[in-house]
């Protein structure tokens, strides 16, 4: 999510390049670009990563938009119950910069002016992005609203039923971290699970995904696909993950 924070039309560009590379792309609800624009930019398989931000009614409208746009799967995210306390962001002044308060942003002005090319691109792309795929009563959700919105959007097993009914297609759960949850996902008709700890960016003491991968694979017993993210930096990491599931 939020690729647009780092590059103009970031999600559109990423999806387009994924298509050129012949691989798939998963678009986060927390994208700075409209899901329709992102899907239109690529011919690659595209999945929509769903957060329940804004509540059930907002999510249902987003699901309908994703269906109409041609996304082929919903990836329901369960590994982000709160916004993580990221120490680097505390030190680098992210909160102050996102506040859009001129007084708190003033100390960072020299750094901004030292990057005129970036600054012009940032303003040219509309400045601080919002979330056009989370449309609330007063318009798209603002960037500073993420924390409170996440705290009110915790996913439960009961949510799977209405999400599946509304979507009608492939449903994947991202953030499964123990075998019991993986087994329950299978029993409830989920098509795949993603073993993920959100890069340990939400809870830094959680177990690495490669350590819990064998437990998840054993629990699903080959009945659904198992994907894994986090910690893969080179080809040897892929070999290790594949080896662990065959022990």
What do these predicted regions represent?
Residues 1-187, 199-202:
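Active-site entrance/lid segments in N-terminal catalytic domains of soluble metabolic enzymes
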Residues 10-13, 208-212:
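Charged helix-capping and loop-helix junction motifs
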Residues 193, 241:
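Hydrophobic, well-ordered secondary-structure elements that form the walls
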Residues 203, 235-238:
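Short glycine/serine/threonine-rich phosphate/pyrophosphate-binding segments
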Residues 245-247:
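Conserved small/polar residues in nucleotide/adenosyl-binding loops
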């Amino acid at each position: 999510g939020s690729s647009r924070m780092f590059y103009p039309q970031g999600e559109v560009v990423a999806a387009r390049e994924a298509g050129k590379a012949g691989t798939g792309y998963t678009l986060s609800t927390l994208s700075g670009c409209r899901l329709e624009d992102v899907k239109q930019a690529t011919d690659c398989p595209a999945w929509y990563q769903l957060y329940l931000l804004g509540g059930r009614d907002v999510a249902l409208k987003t699901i309908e938009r994703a269906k109409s746009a041609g996304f082929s799967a919903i990836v329901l995210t369960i590994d982000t119950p709160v916004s993580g306390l990221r120490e680097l962001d505390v030190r680098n002044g992210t909160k102050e910069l996102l506040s859009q308060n001129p007084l708190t942003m003033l100390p960072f002005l020299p750094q901004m002016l030292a990057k005129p090319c970036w600054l012009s691109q940032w303003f040219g792309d509309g400045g601080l992005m919002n979330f056009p795929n989370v449309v609330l009563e007063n318009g798209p959700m603002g960037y500073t609203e993420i924390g409170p919105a996440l705290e009110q959007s915790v996913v439960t097993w009961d949510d799977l039923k209405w999400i599946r009914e509304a979507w009608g297609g492939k449903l994947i759960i991202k953030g499964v971290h123990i075998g019991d949850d993986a087994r329950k996902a299978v029993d409830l008709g989920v098509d795949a699970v993603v073993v993920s700890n959100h890069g340990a960016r939400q809870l830094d003491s959680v177990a690495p995904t490669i350590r819990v991968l064998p437990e998840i694979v054993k629990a699903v017993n080959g009945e659904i696909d198992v994907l894994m993210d986090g910690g893969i930096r080179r080809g040897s990491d892929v070999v290790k993950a594949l080896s662990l599931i065959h022990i």
